[in-house]
């Protein structure tokens, strides 16, 4: 019987998850089924769709926007990183029938940074722009690599203070940042609107990597802005997407996919 997986979302037609997981299955040498499931934007509809899929033998599921908080509530138990994130992007069915809720977003970021881009995070000064769900989901995995410091900056400073307080790290107002960071990560939604965050341009002086968690076929507005103002290297979040998918796949199947080759495939397709 071919194992079945899905991704729940709304919208979901754009999701690259089926393609990514089929690449992973090719690496493992197995057949899987991976579908997209469009769900209406209510808790009842999400719960019904998730319950139906899992009761019918679904071997695992991914969850994308806007359902990560619904997924957290639906899960029977949670990983430490899901608890830290307050959101779930992966369901892992357990042998006892319970559903483990995990969040692989932060691991996806770290895998892209460390395995794919070759960045050493230990001892680095990291700035995280944004204080929403995207930012919260990556803090714990970043801290696990023992950076010298991790600072959260946000347009609404009180939200940065609130998130920083959860993890006992630093917060800073977005417009009062100083040029003292090795790595700057954009977890705001600015690139969705084709704009860079409202930050002082000189913060990129001395920065060797400016990383946008958003991805696109061409350099994002954040990447362009960072490069123009001194960032030595820029990257988008495609590798994070592949990395979080790989972390989920490994939990489901016990097979660790190679992410670099999949990223190359996706880049080549985007360039066609």
Residue ranges of predicted features:
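Phosphate/diphosphate ligand-binding glycine-rich loop within oxidoreductases
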Residues: 2-117
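NAD(P)-binding Rossmann-fold cofactor-contacting core
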Residues: 145-167
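Helix N-cap at the beta1-alpha1 junction of Rossmann-like dinucleotide-binding domains, i.e.
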Residues: 12-14, 157-158, 217
